[in-house]
Regions:
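Conserved glycine-rich cofactor-binding loop
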Residues: 9, 16-18
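Conserved Rossmann-fold SDR core element
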Residues: 27, 162, 172-187
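Conserved glycine-rich Rossmann-like NAD(P)H-binding loop of the short-chain dehydrogenase/reductase
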Residues: 30-46
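Catalytic Tyr-X3-Lys loop
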Residues: 84, 92, 99-118, 133, ...
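Active-site loop-to-helix junction immediately N-terminal to the catalytic Tyr of the SDR YXXXK motif
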Residues: 101, 147-155, 167, 195
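A short, exposed helix-loop element centered on a Lys and neighboring polar residues
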Residues: 121-122, 166
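Alpha-helical segment proximal to the catalytic Tyr-Lys
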Residues: 126, 170-171
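Short, flexible catalytic-loop segment of classical short-chain dehydrogenase/reductase
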Residues: 145, 184-194, 198, 203
């Protein structure tokens, strides 16, 4: 399938593994030059090698950043330059109900995913609007539309991000920019496996019953 993306420039956050790496590989196969952002330099190097093995003729750039920090968010945007596609995917909201997730955990999780998405959308959208072109994709999660009490911080945060995406996207098309959300269902990434094991431990006192 040719999606007519050859030569386009894309940034993917949370790109060293899981859904983010899958997005990077898919775009690279379509001829996109990709920039991968994540915290861990070692896993970023592995991701870069993996993408280049799949698509050796595209450019791959890596950025080691902590996207829970506003200064790193701005540093990434400045380093990335003009891009055609921006995928917000970085986030690690812990499982737990209202009694087990304290304020510190809420804030730490939301600094990365909720405020990370908000701040990056604001920075990236302004540039895309000025150029009259671009796509922002927010990878959010099914908890936004199927909230569960055992994942309350994610349910609330994801619902807010759907609101952000819907509100921004409703006017962005008039400026030549598309802002859309993807709410993936259950995909057993490393992080989701950890969440499922924690839920199994809470419910059955046996983390091996997560499957």
């Amino acid at each position: 399938m040719d999606l007519e993306l050859t030569g386009k420039r894309a940034v993917i956050t949370g790109a060293s593994k899981g859904i983010g790496l899958g997005c990077a590989v898919g775009l690279a196969r379509e001829g996109c030059h990709v920039q991968l952002a994540a915290r861990n330099k070692e896993t970023l190097r592995d991701a870069e090698a993996f993408v280049l093995n799949v698509a050796p003729n595209i450019d791959v750039v890596t950025h080691s950043v902590d996207l829970s920090l506003s200064e790193d968010q701005k540093r990434l945007v400045n380093a990335a330059g003009e891009v055609d596609i921006w995928i917000n995917n970085a986030g690690a909201i812990p499982a737990g109900d209202i009694t087990t997730i304290d304020e510190r955990l809420w804030r730490e999780a939301w600094d990365l995913k909720v405020f990370g998405y908000i701040n990056l959308c604001r920075e990236v959208y302004a540039d895309m609007e000025a150029r009259g072109t671009g796509v922002i994709i927010n990878v959010i999660g099914a908890a936004a539309v199927r909230p569960q009490p055992s994942y309350i911080a994610g349910a609330v945060g994801n619902s807010g991000l759907v609101g952000l995406t819907t509100a921004l996207g409703s006017r962005s098309v008039q400026k030549g920019v598309r802002v859309v959300a993807i709410n993936p269902g259950l995909i057993v990434t490393d992080r989701m496996g950890h969440i499922l094991r924690q839920e199994a431990l809470d419910r059955f006192d046996d983390e091996d019953r997560w499957e």
